[in-house]
């Protein structure tokens, strides 16, 4: 069904509609015809059954009237033998009766023809005599096979009264050949038959002589029909049949029914013929509709075929979006063509906008790649300078450690000098010598501290360079974020990377400012140390002069030495603090270097994303270029 064309589907639908319509018509008409025909068959069977029973009734009543006439003649003439011979021996009786007879109350039996009866034959013991002597009128027995002739006969008998006294019973045996001829004449052209049955179910006359005097159950072992007035349909096991029962009226003692049996197939043969004709007509109509609708549908489907070709040209051809369908009608196909043109117009406009956007996206991606390359270069320079700062700070730490060691040695020597001064005047010269050495050490310390001060100044300049680089990185990240915002949805990922770079640059700038602040504090401490060392040198020179002048100043010198010792301890403490600061700066510089490396990695990923974006933009331009706009 999916592989059928639309035209074939329309033809199939039309054929199905016709088939369904004819099928419904056939079913409904078949039902109505069946009901009508069934009613007609029932009516005809009932009429035929009534006519048949009337014929049987007329035949039987005529015989009964003959018997009654004979009995009346016997009653008038008397029951003596001559009178009986004259009354019963009439030719009319012998023509209609197989046997005519009279049985008197004295037991005398007279019949025509005489027949062969035993000498002790007594009619009063016979069933017909007993049934008739007490009956108000003529009685009719059930048919039976006569022993003398072997034919199917029945007996009619009527009481004979003389002066209202029973004189005997007149009777006659009647052959049922005439009734059988009436019944067997109804063969319905070989499609049915008739039979005579009693109300008790005994078959009296039947075309099949084997069933005569048998019960109806033997004729219909399956679905035995109920003997009652009316028409019924049964399935005898051989074929469905219609059977009608009509009672024989007019004779009270003859409770008989005429049964008419008709084959259903023959009764409803007209329906089969009509059904065959209707199916043939349906096939002819379907073929005519297919032959007429085929060319008509092909003509009506031309606009749809044109739209299909136009769509294939757009899909499989050069993608020419400038073509439009010609609208030649205002029906559904015209509306469909107009909708198709409107759809192509919208696609045309969208493709033009996509082409423009793809070109802009390619340009933006190219610029972002250039900016990312520049940022990569700046980041490499920043990493190199950060390594230089780290090396300088390591040197600063080494110098601070050396100052601390010198301060410790100076403190030790001051302690020794104080001990020697306490020993006495004799060691003054040694003290002077020690003071001279101390003065030299202090001078050396001043030089070292001044060198430290100069190096911290260099560190400040390096930090200014780091701050400047961070500011430039921040500006570059800001420019990259602006360019990513212009790129729209395609630059969203790059905007996130640019924002991360800008945050790293800002954090680098903050760390550099903190380092700058620490270095300034270190420079202040170094200047204070220089001042203190200068003062110590001056005091040492005064102490040497005083030592040369007088020994009594030894105590004062000792106190001064102690002061110098305290100052040296302060210098040692300041130097240790400077060492701690330098280590902290070293940690910060290492962290800055790590962050800078992360920034380089992020820039590298950004550059890869930009290259992919540039490739996608080129692919988009290639796809858009496949359409003619």
Curated annotation (Swiss-Prot):
- Residues forming the Methyl-accepting transducer domain are 357-593
Which residue numbers delimit the Cache domain?
36-258
PROSITE patterns, sorted: CHEMOTAXIS_TRANSDUC_2, HAMP
Topology in the lipid bilayer: Multi-pass membrane protein
Membrane side Periplasmic: which residues?
31-276
Its annotated compartments are:
Cell inner membrane
Q: Which UniProt keywords apply?
A: Cell inner membrane, Cell membrane, Chemotaxis, Membrane, Methylation, Transducer, Transmembrane, Transmembrane helix
List GO terms (cellular component aspect).
plasma membrane
Q: What happens when the gene is disrupted?
A: Mutant does not respond to L-Asp, whereas chemotaxis to D-Asp and L-Glu is significantly reduced. Mutant shows increased c-di-GMP level, a modest but significant increase in biofilm formation and reduced swarming motility. It also shows reduced virulence in tomato plants.
Disulfide pairings: none
Function (record text)? Chemotactic-signal transducers respond to changes in the concentration of attractants and repellents in the environment, transduce a signal from the outside to the inside of the cell, and facilitate sensory adaptation through the variation of the level of methylation. PscA recognizes specifically and with high affinity L-Asp, D-Asp and L-Glu. It exerts a double function, in mediating chemotaxis to these amino acids and in modulating cyclic di-GMP (c-di-GMP) levels, causing alterations in biofilm development. Plays a key role in the infection process.
Q: Which family does it belong to?
A: Belongs to the methyl-accepting chemotaxis (MCP) protein family.
Please report the name of this protein according to its UniProt entry.
Methyl-accepting chemotaxis protein PscA
Q: Provide the species name.
A: Pseudomonas syringae pv. tomato (strain ATCC BAA-871 / DC3000)
């Amino acid at each position: 069904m999916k592989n059928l064309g639309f035209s074939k589907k329309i033809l199939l639908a039309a054929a199905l509609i016709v088939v369904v319509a004819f099928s419904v018509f056939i079913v409904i008409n078949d039902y109505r015809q069946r009901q009508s025909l069934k009613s007609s068959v029932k009516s005809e069977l009932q009429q035929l059954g009534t006519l048949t029973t009337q014929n049987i009734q007329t035949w039987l009543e005529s015989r009964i009237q003959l018997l009654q006439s004979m009995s009346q003649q016997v009653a008038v003439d008397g029951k003596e033998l001559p009178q009986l011979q004259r009354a019963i021996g009439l030719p009319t009786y012998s023509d209609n009766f197989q046997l005519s007879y009279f049985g008197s109350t004295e037991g005398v039996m007279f019949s025509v023809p005489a027949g062969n009866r035993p000498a002790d034959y007594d009619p009063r013991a016979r069933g017909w005599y007993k049934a008739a002597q007490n009956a108000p009128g003529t009685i009719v027995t059930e048919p039976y096979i006569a022993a003398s002739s072997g034919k199917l006969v029945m007996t009619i008998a009527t009481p004979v009264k003389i002066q209202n006294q029973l004189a005997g019973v007149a009777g006659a045996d009647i052959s049922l050949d005439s009734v059988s001829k009436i019944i067997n004449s109804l063969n319905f052209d070989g499609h049915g038959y008739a039979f005579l049955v009693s109300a008790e179910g005994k078959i009296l006359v039947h075309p099949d002589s084997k069933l005569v005097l048998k019960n109806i159950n033997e004729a219909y072992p399956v679905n035995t029909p109920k003997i009652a007035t009316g028409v019924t349909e049964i399935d005898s096991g051989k074929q469905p049949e219609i059977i009608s029962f009509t009672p024989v009226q007019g004779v009270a003692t003859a409770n008989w029914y005429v049964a008419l049996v008709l084959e259903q197939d023959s009764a409803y043969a007209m329906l089969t013929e009509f059904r065959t004709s209707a199916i043939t007509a349906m096939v002819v109509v379907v073929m005519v509709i297919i032959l007429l609708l085929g060319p008509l549908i092909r003509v009506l489907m031309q606009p749809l075929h044109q739209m299909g070709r136009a769509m294939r040209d757009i899909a499989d051809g050069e993608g020419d979006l400038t073509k439009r369908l010609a609208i030649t009608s205002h029906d559904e196909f015209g509306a469909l063509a107009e909708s198709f043109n409107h759809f192509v117009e919208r696609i045309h406009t969208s493709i033009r906008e996509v082409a423009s956007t793809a070109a802009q996206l390619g340009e933006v991606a190219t610029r972002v790649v250039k900016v990312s390359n520049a940022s990569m270069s700046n980041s490499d320079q920043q990493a190199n300078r950060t390594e230089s700062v780290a090396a300088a700070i390591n040197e600063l730490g080494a110098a601070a450690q050396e100052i601390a060691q010198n301060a410790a040695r100076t403190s030790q020597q001051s302690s020794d000098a104080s001990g020697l001064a306490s020993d006495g005047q004799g060691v003054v010269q040694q003290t002077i010598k020690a003071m001279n050495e101390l003065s030299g050490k202090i001078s050396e310390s001043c030089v070292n501290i001044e060198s430290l001060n100069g190096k911290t100044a260099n560190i400040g300049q390096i930090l200014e360079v780091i701050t400047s680089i961070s500011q430039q990185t921040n500006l570059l990240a800001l420019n990259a974020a602006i360019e990513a915002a212009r790129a729209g949805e395609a630059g969203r990922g790059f905007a996130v990377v640019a924002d991360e770079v800008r945050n790293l640059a800002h954090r680098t700038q903050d760390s550099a400012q903190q380092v700058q602040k620490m270095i300034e504090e270190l420079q202040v401490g170094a200047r204070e140390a220089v001042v203190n060392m200068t003062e110590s040198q001056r005091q040492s020179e005064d102490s040497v002069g005083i030592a040369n002048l007088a020994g009594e100043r030894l105590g004062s010198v000792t106190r001064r030495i102690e002061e110098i010792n305290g100052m040296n301890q302060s210098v040692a403490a300041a130097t240790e603090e400077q060492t701690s600061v330098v280590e902290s700066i070293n940690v910060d510089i290492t962290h800055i270097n790590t962050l800078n490396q992360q920034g380089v990695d992020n820039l590298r990923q950004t550059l890869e994303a930009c290259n992919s974006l540039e490739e996608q933009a080129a692919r988009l331009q290639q796809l858009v270029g496949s359409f003619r706009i």
